[in-house]
Amino acid sequence: MASRKEGTGSSATSSSSTTGAAGKGKGKGGSGDSAVKQVQIDGLVVLKIIKHYQEEGQGTEVVQGVLLGLVVEDRLEITNCFPFPQHTEDDADFDEVQYQMEMMRSLRHVNIDHLHVGWYQSTYYGSFVTRALLDSQFSYQHAIEESVVLIYDPIKTAQGSLSLKAYRLTPKLMEVCKEKDFSPEALKKGNITFEHMFEEVPIVIKNSHLINVLMWELEKKSAVADKHELLSLASSNHLGKTLQLLMDRVDEMSQDIVKYNTYMRNTSKQQQQKHQYQQRRQQENMQRQSRGEPPLPEEDLSKLFKPHQPPARMDSLLIAGQINTYCQNIKEFTAQNLGKLFMAQALQEYNS
């Protein structure tokens, strides 16, 4: 699966010449305000994404695909999509870039929007803040500034509420990724925190008038709403699994903090040794000067005291961002259930 994610990012760069029209004069980069203020998705695209996961997604395995559409002012309209086929690393003959180009060429022949505007991915209990997603979205957004990534959560959707969110990398993070410098000093200079990594773009799902009429008629004929228990509590398995994933990420964060603290202690110790060495040389030079002897030759301190390599902090930011996502999911889950409990209590007191 990792190879497919890496291929996703590289394919965006390879197809930038084909999809350049999607970026209407914005150019490459990520500076300034966000180029996209709203994402409009056709209902057909949502159904295709859901169908793709139901057919090929299982367990922790995620499904991915390409989003097609166009840009109208500050609104990104997603009108079609197609999936990445499931393949293993043994399929050496499979060329993902060639597959995407063939698909877009076929769509162009039948007069369907074929401009590359992003990609989508399913998630497992909200576990999508990863380095692979960051690298892929950077490749897309660097080639096509308006690109977004749609994150589809099948577990939340199965509970009765469609979970589909659009994300983009913030301009600050785009600049840091361009420099490829994830040292503590670079992230501090860019004022990058886990809250300034991804920006969520509002989503609007659009259907034709005929589809809206059909859905209205089906809703009147459906008896599902009458049988649905509005005050039934959600399964505790979701909460337990999310808490387990949260604890795993907290453990990873603790290990990363230990590594960083070790680096800081070693750096501080080295600075003290360097300062003591300079003082000893200065005292010895003063003694040699008093005896009329020449001072000691200059030495390259960087060779004597090789600076420790600072640990990259991007992984720590990603872990912190994932922890924040888990906390938001737990907050949303518990808020819904607590609301149902209070409503059930009020109804019971009213009927008694």
Swiss-Prot record:
Molecular-function GO terms, alphabetical: metallopeptidase activity; translation initiation factor activity
Cellular compartments annotated: Cytoplasm
PANTHER family per record: EUKARYOTIC TRANSLATION INITIATION FACTOR 3 -RELATED (PTHR10410)
Annotated GO biological process: formation of cytoplasmic translation initiation complex; translational initiation
Low complexity bias spans: 8-21, 270-289
S-S bridge residues: none
Keywords: Cytoplasm, Initiation factor, Isopeptide bond, Phosphoprotein, Protein biosynthesis, Ubl conjugation
Chief place where the protein resides: cytoplasm
PROSITE patterns tied to this protein: MPN
Described purpose of this protein according to its UniProt entry: Component of the eukaryotic translation initiation factor 3 (eIF-3) complex, which is required for several steps in the initiation of protein synthesis. The eIF-3 complex associates with the 40S ribosome and facilitates the recruitment of eIF-1, eIF-1A, eIF-2:GTP:methionyl-tRNAi and eIF-5 to form the 43S pre-initiation complex (43S PIC). The eIF-3 complex stimulates mRNA recruitment to the 43S PIC and scanning of the mRNA for AUG recognition.
Gly residues bias (residue ranges): 22-32
Family of this protein: Belongs to the eIF-3 subunit H family.
Annotated positions of the Phosphoserine modification: S3, S183
InterPro entries linked: eIF3h, eIF3h_C, JAMM/MPN+_dom, JAMM_MPN+_peptidase_M67A, MPN
Pfam families on file: eIF3h_C, JAB
Position(s), cross-link Glycyl lysine isopeptide (Lys-Gly) (interchain with G-Cter in SUMO2): K303
Protein name per its UniProtKB record: Eukaryotic translation initiation factor 3 subunit H
Domain MPN: 39-173
Record gene name: EIF3H
Region (Disordered): 1-34, 265-308
Quaternary structure annotation from Swiss-Prot or TrEMBL: Component of the eukaryotic translation initiation factor 3 (eIF-3) complex, which is composed of 13 subunits: EIF3A, EIF3B, EIF3C, EIF3D, EIF3E, EIF3F, EIF3G, EIF3H, EIF3I, EIF3J, EIF3K, EIF3L and EIF3M. The eIF-3 complex appears to include 3 stable modules: module A is composed of EIF3A, EIF3B, EIF3G and EIF3I; module B is composed of EIF3F, EIF3H, and EIF3M; and module C is composed of EIF3C, EIF3D, EIF3E, EIF3K and EIF3L. EIF3C of module C binds EIF3B of module A and EIF3H of module B, thereby linking the three modules. EIF3J is a labile subunit that binds to the eIF-3 complex via EIF3B.
One GO CC annotation: eukaryotic 48S preinitiation complex
